[in-house]
Amino acid sequence: MNSQTHGNTWIDKLGLPKPLAWGYLGIIIFMMGDGVEQGWLSPYLLENGMTIQQSALLFTVYGVTIAISSWFSGVLAEGYGPRKAMMMGLLLYIIGTIGFVGFGMAKLDYGVMLVTYAIRGFGYPLFAYSFLVWITYRTPKDRLGRAVGWFWFVFTGGLNVFGAYYSSWAIETIGYQNTLWSSIFWVLVGAFFALVLNKDRFVPAGDAGSKTKELLKGLTIVREEPKVFIGGLVRVINTTAQFAFPVFLPIYMAQHGFSTKEWLQIWGTIFTSNIAFNLIFGFVGDRLGWRSTIMWFGGVGCGITTLLFFYSPVWFGGGFWPVLISGVLWGGLLAGYVPLSALVPSLVKKDKGAAMAILNLGAGLPVFVGPAIVGALIGTIGDEGVIWVLSGLYFLSALLTRFITMPTTDTVPVETSVAH
């Protein structure tokens, strides 16, 4: 489809595809705009009269549209080109934000909020994950682990770090609703870098018939290559806790004496460590093996640190630093799943867009699954029971990853290191 980029500049040696550098910058700014409400929206809604179940449902519906959009992003990017898919995501994001803030939040109209927040949910997967497909086609295989590590670096840095730190300042300076309005400015700036300054060309595949066929491949590939499906399941588990935590942990932390600002600072610092380790585990995966990195650092590591993060306010008497450190450990090990974005598309010789569609669906589903787990279980087993469920899922993902094996004729770094 496209000739892959090969270069020897310092940018290439870092594993960052030089032709797409502006796109990476655009992603971090766009995702900062998208992440302005993640750490505070749930407690804000509770303070304004909604129940935690209503809040969980709002995030669940939002997650459903994110999951749908995530699946379509892979095949639309391959069939129509990443630029068109990303532009579609930008427009849907802006439309949804205008409706959610201007009509839903302004009047606290729950029905309007459900519909418009769902529309907003179509936005960022089409924008960000279409760019990820772009990366997989334009990067040499021996550098792909690092290239996707950089993607998750900018994705997470924008969504969870800059978004959290910016909102901790903005909500006190310009207020909650104006903070959400400002997200439109940031996504437009991000789109300028990713779509205007980024001059790299991606040639879409085929005619209308082949594009329809490409959409169907996003479903049929799981039958043709079941390991792609397993990879998608592992990707779901990867960030389920990340999207479950904001629904109930701010309230849990408040019970142990943490203010909203302190929680946002903890959340932002957690993902500061995460973005650093996104890069580290990109390199580690290319050398130690993608599968081993996912199993031990991602699955087992996150299973343990999820429990540590939850119990640290109890064990350490509500101390800020022990909670922060335990959260940082969880955030760092969360990056152990980064090699999935290299492993899954490498399971197939062709139809990488379809394989990425499954992986992108796996990245989108946690936005639905995480809040759904909280909404369904917290009333019966409490927040402690929910945390054990989330921890157990991580250990399950380690077991599942054992079955994601590459053909013996392939040379990608699944279990052995690759010389560079």
Label every model-predicted segment.
Residues 2-17, 199-232, 420:
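Juxtamembrane intracellular "pre-TM" segments in multi-pass secondary transporters
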Residues 70-81, 171, 278-290, 378:
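Helix-to-loop junctions at the C-terminal end of transmembrane segments
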Residues 91-107, 300-316:
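C-terminal ends and interior cores of transmembrane alpha-helices
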